[in-house]
């Protein structure tokens, strides 16, 4: 990759891409004034302060002062209709499995952050809105 092969280059990429390509990440200063490297753990600390609106959009709290929080994170969304539907049972089951079983076991090993704590509870509350009919 260009960044790996050109000393001093800067880019933004998912942690999994950096790990796959052997590219070093920079420690970033967070609102607590501490320089923190990206990891599933430091991202989880940051995301725990995020809010989820009624429509499911995540707002990161850029004033959160957790000392071990890495402040540069992207959020992936699972999208579904919440309207009553018999087929929503499978969709709801998939999202619940992904958040509560698959991600905790596999996300960190793939360079991603499983949701934990209050942000996981908020995500589970969004899944609960899927009306299975």
Question: Each PLM stretch: what is its role?
Answer:
Residues 1, 47-68:
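Cyclophilin-type peptidyl-prolyl cis-trans isomerase
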Residues 1-50:
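Ligand-binding pocket segment of bilobal, Venus flytrap-like solute-binding proteins
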Residues 10, 15-18, 37, 47, ...:
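Generic detector of leucine side chains in alpha-helical contexts
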Residues 10, 23-28, 54-61, 73, ...:
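Generic preference for hydrophobic/aromatic residues in regular secondary structure cores
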Residues 39-41, 52-62, 84-90:
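Phosphate-binding glycine-rich loops and adjacent basic patches that engage nucleotide phosphates
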Residues 62-133:
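Extracellular/periplasmic juxtamembrane helices and adjacent flexible linkers that interface
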